[in-house]
Amino acid sequence: MEKWWFNLILSNEELEHRCRLSKSMARPRPIGNTNGSQDPSINDRDKNGSDSGNYSFSNLDHLFDVKDNLSFIYDDTFLVRDSNGDSYSIYFDIENLIFEIDNDSFFLSKLESSFSNYLNSGSKNYNRYYDSYMYDTKYSWNNHINSYIDSYLCSEIRIDSYISSGIYNYSENYIYSYVWNGENVSTIKSRSSSIRTSANSSDINLKGRYNDFDINIKYRHLWVQCDNCYGLNYKKIFSSKMNICEQCGYHLKMSSSERIELSIDSGTWDPMNEDMVSTDPIEFHSEEEPYRDRIDSYQIKTGLTEAVQTGIGQLNGMPIAIGVMDFQFMGGSMGSVVGEKITRLIEYATNRSLPVIIVCASGGARMQEGSLSLMQMAKISSALYNYQLNKKLFYVSILTSPTTGGVTASFGMLGDIIIAEPNAYIAFAGKRVIEQTLNKTVPEGSQAAEYSFHKGLFDSIVPRNLLKGALSELLQLHGFFPLNHNSQVKR
């Protein structure tokens, strides 16, 4: 059971609230705004003090605004101090619906009475934040207390996504992604341990909290939410961080253009076959959206003509041929155009004796093109056979999340060196397909890169920020060296 300090301030007109948390329960120190209320009259009243019997509780319900917040702590004691400096211990046990106060006073009796009334009547008093579905059930009472506590936190704490890169071990903090005004990062790091909740006493769902706040919808122009820890990353600098979550290190998806910028030296990228587009070869029938219209919509959305970009460039001065698949374009599905562009890239590299790097990110063959999409597996594999076995050239396959289906069954696993990104989802058939087909449960994490690596499926797991250096060393190991400054790759 954890103990928390709260500082309550009451005024004659309304209930103001402030929050104080501290490592030392005997001597609490503020972590938020320590300058007092912005209202001078409230500051004066707080300094002078007044008889608790004169307090007006006409706006007491403001403290108990009901919102759909995440589950708070199930078994905690809060040390509460009113404006007179009197301290009280408030015990919450949400699971067993227990609310106890250790010191009887006018204020605390009103507070306890409010909670009792809530339990008995469902808190049917008017509340401008009230939702109709919160009237009864244990879930309602849970959220009632959550909002009570959140009202303190939100008054002093500013939502932000980044505390410190060194706080990864505190993923279960209730205030995991908050930054306190007026405190530097080192201070926050040192105090973060004091507000870490016990694993035995809390089960905090970070995803639920962010969904409650509608952060993705309201602030998606500012933040990128991590798929793993559900923390927020500042969008303006996210690309410079290589789309790696600053809070947990998870590798989020990248567009093909971002990967090209990451891997290829500036000013050396020369794309190939950009004008090649699909023409709906089998006239695929769709009740929702015609295939041709769907292609057009993805072209507008992504700025690409197809789900792969191919071309030549330099990697630390070494000329390479590279193809980068883009999952944002119809899930990176492999149709006839994708297969043709990759095949032409390999044939070009064969004629010029260039190393080939293909970055895979695909859901598999494109169903809208039927057997033509399946034939791309054989076509690309045939081109690689000539490239690798006959010409003895070097091919590196990079598997990113997700790499599944026909890509996994063909060129994705044919590299001389196969590299995967951390936590990448790599499989032939997806979890749901396997479970429905075999009627067996697929163990969690069995299709992650780390699991497959230990089974020998590929050669190495390389973090994104180290990838370019690793590729450079591999190329030099296989006899490829940087060009002279005056040399250029000619097509």
Swiss-Prot record:
Coiled coil segments of this chain: none
Start-end of Polar residues biased regions: 32-41
Origin superkingdom: Eukaryota
Cross-referenced InterPro entries: AcCoA_carboxyl_beta (IPR034733), Acetyl_CoA_COase_Trfase_b_su (IPR000438), ClpP/crotonase-like_dom_sf (IPR029045), COA_CT_N (IPR011762)
Binding, Zn(2+): 226, 229, 245, 248
This protein's UniProt keywords: ATP-binding, Chloroplast, Fatty acid biosynthesis, Fatty acid metabolism, Lipid biosynthesis, Lipid metabolism, Metal-binding, Nucleotide-binding, Plastid, Transferase, Zinc, Zinc-finger
Pathway linked to the protein: Lipid metabolism; malonyl-CoA biosynthesis; malonyl-CoA from acetyl-CoA: step 1/1
Catalytic reaction(s) noted: N(6)-carboxybiotinyl-L-lysyl-[protein] + acetyl-CoA = N(6)-biotinyl-L-lysyl-[protein] + malonyl-CoA
Single GO cellular component term: chloroplast stroma
Cofactor note (record): Binds 1 zinc ion per subunit.
GO biological process: fatty acid biosynthetic process; malonyl-CoA biosynthetic process
Top EC class of this enzyme: transferase
Zinc finger (C4-type): 226-248
Region (Disordered): 26-49
Localization: Plastid, Chloroplast stroma
Domain called CoA carboxyltransferase N-terminal: residue spans: 222-491
An example Gene Ontology molecular-function term: zinc ion binding
Primary location: plastid
Cofactor(s), names only, from the UniProt record: Zn(2+)
Similarity-based family: Belongs to the AccD/PCCB family.
Function of the protein: Component of the acetyl coenzyme A carboxylase (ACC) complex. Biotin carboxylase (BC) catalyzes the carboxylation of biotin on its carrier protein (BCCP) and then the CO(2) group is transferred by the transcarboxylase to acetyl-CoA to form malonyl-CoA.
Quaternary structure and partners: Acetyl-CoA carboxylase is a heterohexamer composed of biotin carboxyl carrier protein, biotin carboxylase and 2 subunits each of ACCase subunit alpha and ACCase plastid-coded subunit beta (accD).
Protein name per the record: Acetyl-coenzyme A carboxylase carboxyl transferase subunit beta, chloroplastic
Species for this entry: Ceratophyllum demersum
Gene giving rise to this polypeptide: accD
